[in-house]
């Protein structure tokens, strides 16, 4: 039976306690299209974490650029207008699908410097040293963002490289108005910025505190972008900018060298591909755990009638939580950099394997995580990542998730170059087999080694239906990335939501350990909560989960953008 959407999530206030969610039954995409108030676009759509970045991407598309051209321009624009996660000094992953169905994955994840070693964050007693992998020059991995964009443009871009850098340069030179959220974030970190940047940084206001509407001008960052515009890859990994990075290392106790920078290479990798209810799901392969985790979750729940049970019904939540519990246990033990560790990818996304894992589920009571798997779990990834989705008029699609790890990364701005360094080294297991700074165990597959890429949860994803593009989706959110993308896909395919409704809908998270379910802002209704708690599930509320930016292609070919209201995200199209 088909029904209309019973609750408009766009109007809900995140942070409100006691949200009551009505159940949904399945609705066909054509019904969703007819009933939806979400705008649709005939040609291209860009959805990013910042209005200025979305404008940049849309302008590229309108001027004849393709999805990859727009993605490159957006990436550099985000480095200016979204400094807490958009970056030059970080890395990420891209999943690409051409209008003809060709797919590719690009790994521009950061790497450990050549002088890195597995015990580099431990004291003389072998215990992790607080903040050493989180702040300062030693926490930085070798950045991959610039090389990633160079490689993406060289293979799939059509517009002039220099032209794609101009909007970001202008935003850095002329400044852009801070949102209230951004002003508050910068003010909260003032003391840390002063500590790690004794020579000052554009992120520190000369007098008083930042306020919404203040212009953030970043002249040093503009100069770095000009180097990249004029010299491409060499403008960052060699010459003046590279020298400034190494000089910054020497101001602290950093170990990144000119050789590390010169030798960095982003890698083209085959995306991981699977199916869910007749749809083809294309996502990022390791060293991202996202694609494998997402496909394993989808396979784990595929046999259950979720659409009949309804959105966030008691049975739906039980199945999803038990799937998440099992998949995150496997993620902890079996995933790492495939250049250093043999990842059993085929097994982890196999239908029979995941169905068998679900056989131990008991609908009458919660599973105990220690009884599901007693393996080791890697440290969590920060939630300060960013994602953007782009589809051009021809149907080429790009899904990119990028990060510098924690909000504002290492808090170190490269003196003279104006960009923040990542603190991605914290995504390694500082001490395999012992609790890390978060009280979680670290896996051997993710131990620190020179030149190795740290494990990630980033999950840039593209979905097809009957050989045609259907959805482009991804999110920041650290360990919640995989479950957020999982839920948004189910919201569309099982619960008949349109793209904006699927993004707006409240989310929950479970990651094997710790034991509890984490609904955002009391998202699970009170009756369902009581039923789950009576069965032994522990539920602890938390704040917002993820900031999903996604695009849905409707049966008539028009496109919907879904921009997450949890942030300043904006969807634009034409």
Please annotate each region the language model reported:
Residues 431, 452, 485, 494-543:
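Extended C-terminal subregions enriched in glycine
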Residues 86-87, 91-98, 386-390, 460-462, ...:
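Short beta-strand scaffold segments in enzyme catalytic cores
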């Amino acid at each position: 039976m088909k029904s209309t959407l019973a609750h408009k999530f766009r109007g809900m206030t995140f942070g409100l306690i006691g949200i009551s969610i009505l159940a949904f039954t399945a609705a066909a995409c054509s019904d969703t299209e007819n009933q939806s108030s979400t705008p649709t676009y005939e040609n291209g759509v860009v959805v990013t974490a910042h209005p200025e970045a979305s404008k940049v991407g849309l302008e590229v598309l309108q001027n004849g650029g393709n999805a990859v051209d727009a993605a490159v321009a957006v990436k550099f624009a985000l480095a200016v207008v979204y400094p807490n996660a958009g970056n030059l000094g970080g890395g990420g992953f891209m999943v690409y699908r051409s209008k003809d169905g060709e797919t590719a994955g690009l790994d521009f994840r950061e790497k450990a410097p050549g002088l890195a070693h597995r015990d580099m964050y431990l004291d003389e007693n072998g215990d992790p040293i607080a903040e050493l992998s989180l702040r300062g020059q030693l926490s930085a991995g070798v950045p991959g963002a610039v090389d990633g964009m160079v490689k993406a443009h060289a293979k799939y871009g059509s517009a002039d490289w220099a032209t794609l850098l101009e909007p970001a340069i202008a935003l850095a030179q002329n400044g852009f108005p801070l949102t209230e959220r951004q002003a508050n974030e910068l003010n909260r970190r003032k003391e840390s910025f002063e500590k790690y940047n004794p020579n000052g940084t554009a992120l520190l206001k000369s007098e008083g505190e930042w306020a919404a509407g203040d212009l953030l001008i970043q002249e040093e960052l503009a100069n770095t972008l000009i180097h990249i515009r004029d010299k491409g890859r060499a403008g960052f990994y060699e010459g003046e900018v590279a020298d400034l990075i190494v000089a910054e290392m020497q101001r602290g106790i950093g170990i990144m060298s000119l050789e590390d920078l010169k030798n960095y290479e982003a890698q083209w990798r085959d995306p991981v591909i699977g199916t869910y209810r007749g749809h083809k799901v294309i996502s990022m392969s390791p060293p991202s755990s996202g694609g494998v985790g997402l496909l394993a979750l989808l396979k784990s729940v595929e046999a259950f009638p979720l659409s009949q049970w309804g959105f966030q019904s008691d049975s739906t939540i039980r199945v999803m939580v038990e799937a998440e519990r099992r998949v995150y246990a496997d993620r902890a033990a079996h995933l790492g950099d495939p250049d250093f560790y043999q990842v059993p990818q085929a097994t982890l996304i196999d239908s029979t394997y995941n169905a068998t894992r679900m056989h131990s589920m008991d609908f009458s009571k919660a599973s105990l995580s220690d009884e599901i798997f007693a393996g080791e779990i890697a440290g969590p990834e920060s939630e300060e990542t960013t994602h953007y989705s782009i589809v051009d008029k021809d149907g080429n699609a790009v899904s990119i998730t990028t990060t510098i790890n924690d909000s504002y990364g290492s808090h170190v701005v490269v003196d003279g170059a104006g960009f923040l360094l990542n603190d991605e080294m914290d995504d390694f297991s500082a001490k395999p087999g012992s609790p890390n700074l978060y009280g979680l165990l670290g896996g051997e597959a993710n131990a620190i080694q020179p030149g190795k890429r740290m494990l990630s949860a980033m999950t840039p994803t593209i979905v097809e239906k009957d050989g045609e593009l259907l959805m482009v989706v991804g999110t920041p959110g650290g360990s919640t990335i995989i479950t957020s993308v999982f839920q948004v896909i189910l919201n569309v395919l099982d619960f008949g939501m349109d793209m904006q409704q699927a993004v707006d809908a409240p989310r929950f998270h479970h990651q094997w350990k710790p034991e509890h379910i984490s609904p955002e802002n009391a998202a699970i209704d009170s009756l369902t909560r009581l039923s789950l708690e009576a069965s032994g599930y522990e539920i602890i509320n938390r704040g917002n989960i993820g900031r999903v930016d996604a695009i849905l292609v409707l049966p008539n070919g028009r496109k919907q953008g879904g921009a997450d209201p949890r942030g300043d995200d904006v969807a634009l199209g034409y």
